Amino acid sequence: MIREIFPGVYVAEIETEMVGVRHLNYSFLRGAASERSVLIDCGFPEKADPSCGTALREVMRMLGFRPDRLDVLITHGHKDHLGQARALAAEGARIFVNPEDMDQSAILNTLLMDEAGRRQLFRLVGLETYDRETYEAFWQAADCFSEGYEGVWDFPYLPIRPGDCRQVGDYRLEVTALPGHTRGELGFFARAQKFIFSGDHILEEVAPIVSNIGEFPNALSSYIASLGEAAARFSDYLFVPGHGAPFRNPRTAVEKTIRYYHRHCENLYHIVRAAGEPLLLRDIGAMAYRRYQRPLTEKEREVCIQIWFKTYACLKYLEEQGALREEIKEGASYWQSLQ
């Protein structure tokens, strides 16, 4: 479905075939005759999700956009937001990304894409303490995070940073920092018309995953602070997220997300405190989500891998608050209560 939310501003909501991502948005701003038009984010790579690539080309055809007259502004470096950047760049599109976020995304994704990085991650969460069959089953599940994504971050790009601005038709797009979901996530907003392309910073349907694994210290506390700032600064704006329908009144979604993380952190704290002994990261996640009570399907193991990232961010937040302490033993993350 394509909707024109302002004159010359289009949002196309696309269904995907990917685990954990039911739909995503392609947003376009039509430039003046002498200008390049703009696309905000570009979905999964076609090799990983052929329907995503087909949908983008069909929307571009219907709206009359050509790759060689297109600037693609990336909100953040996750593969469901820059997946087709390489293909579009090969056809003449210019890709703009925050270099800080590309660096962090490379670190995070290497943990699953690269064999050495994956072993490091599995050691950190405590998988090496389990039987070989469990380890290999999770290894196979982790392949879904690499298959179809070869070279996905390997494309030429131009830097774009908070404070930059550009004119696109009647719209002056300004760039703002929205840290939390990733370290360098960006928002693109039109002050006069009061709308903002907000990536995955604020979503109505789910609480975005926050991860401390990688070079992003204090990720959750940064995210909570940034949510409050965005809700206050853009309180009367139309939010155009990376997933889901555009919405107003961001305060409702922000408060829902913060409540979710506070409840989740409280639950993790009580799990660790009740144990009376150090717990591995994977065990804490299993208890919190009540998983691993039966053999898991491969899709469920894929979800569990994503849970590790969120759980670690929450535990590091509790450590920052002085409630828990982490100890690394032979590369594995153990947690115990300080209160």
Residues covered by each model-derived region:
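A short catalytic or substrate-binding loop motif that flags glycine-/basic-rich loops and adjacent residues
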Residues: 19-22, 158-160, 179-182
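Conserved beta-strand hairpin/beta-sheet module of binuclear metal-dependent hydrolase folds
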Residues: 2-63, 188-204
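Divalent metal-coordination and catalytic microenvironments
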Residues: 8, 29, 41, 76, ...
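Hydrophobic "anchor" residues on beta-strands that sit immediately upstream
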Residues: 37, 72, 94, 196, ...
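C-terminal regulatory/interaction regions
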Residues: 271-339
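Histidine-centered divalent metal-coordination motifs
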Residues: 71-81, 181, 185, 243, ...
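Active-site HxH/HxHxD metal-binding segment of metal-dependent hydrolases
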Residues: 48, 54, 59-166
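Metallo-beta-lactamase
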Residues: 42-46, 50, 148-155, 172-265
